[in-house]
Design a protein with these regions (language model features):
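N-terminal low-complexity, acidic/polar interaction/targeting segments
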Residues: 1-201
Length: 201
């Protein structure tokens, strides 16, 4: 299915079902969000590049308007919905619009062993980073997005995950990524603990 979608380029990767708070202050995006609110339509969140945007993005629906400021600025919360691929960009408005094609995952499920490993590693990373523990829904068909969206991972890696059309591939990629970053995290925590204990690193 294809559609014409207004785009909001950001230095972020939005996943399906992920919540994202936004502060809208630029006139062109105040106009865009105003139209989306009036028409109850989604917009596309795409990762901004130097002179362009990423080819793969995620549509976003406005879930809540937290505050409308007197100068027209907005504080909103959006939720990721469907992934899309940009087919062409339209520059007729003050903000970008794009012809997009939505896509879903290919059939297939995660291996239970990959899920168990990913959830265990994720919990350790959250603990090392001092984050709040949460219980992921291991029956979620796109569990990889839930796990990746809860951590401040490398944006290039998140962008790669967003474009993969296999949940199994994403989960395997997550396990490999978690295993790669954990040694440095463990060392960093030990250094901090040692410094806090005796005043020396």
């Amino acid at each position: 299915m294809s559609a014409l979608l207004p785009l909001f380029p950001l230095d972020v990767v939005l996943f399906p079902d992920m919540s994202l708070p936004l502060h809208i202050f630029e006139p062109r995006y105040k106009e865009m969000i105003g139209e989306c609110l009036a028409d109850k339509t989604p917009f596309g969140v795409v990762r901004a590049k130097k002179n362009s945007v990423a080819e793969i993005g995620c549509s976003a629906e406005i879930a809540n308007v937290i505050k409308k400021h007197e100068d027209g600025k907005l504080d909103i919360v959006v939720e990721g919905r469907q992934r899309f691929q940009i087919r062409g960009v339209n520059h007729d408005r003050s903000f970008l619009k794009a012809e997009v094609s939505y896509f879903e995952d290919e059939p297939g499920a995660n291996k239970p062993s990959d899920v168990t490993r990913a959830v265990k590693l994720h919990a350790e990373i959250v603990g090392l980073m001092g984050g709040e523990a949460f219980a992921p829904d291991v029956q979620e068909p796109q569990l990889s997005f839930q796990l990746a969206g809860a951590l401040p991972l490398d944006l290039d890696f998140k962008q790669t995950l967003l474009g993969l059309r296999s949940e199994s591939e994403r989960m395997i990629g997550l396990v490999e990524y978690f295993e790669a970053i954990l040694p440095n995290l463990r060392r960093a925590v030990k250094v901090r603990q040692k410094a806090g204990g005796n005043g020396h690193a």
